[in-house]
Amino acid sequence: MKNITHINKDNKPQMVDVSKKRITARYAHAQSTVVFPKEITSRFVNGDIASAKGPVFSTAIIAGVMAAKKTYELIPFCHPIGLDDCELNINLDEAGAAIINCICKVEHRTGVEMEAM
């Protein structure tokens, strides 16, 4: 069986030691699709959903970037990294589904896949 990086030789959870890795440019792109029911798609105006509390997708973009910056606080064993860039976009396709893309970049010893997701 292949070694699982977050389990040590004593079968205990551990954070991966990245101290000996070189600092390199890291990039991750995550994409998700959210399909809405008709009663929601009928509320789309100019590519967003207007609500009493403001534009839903714009608020989601802000919250998504905030979450990417705090990934290490939310997922055990993620390394704290200072993102160099986090670009989050939400676009509607012809059927009214939201296509969500997040691209994260950093120069670090570890990747940014979890932050992008």
Predicted regions and their residues:
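C-terminal binding/interaction regions
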Residues: M1-H79, D84-M117
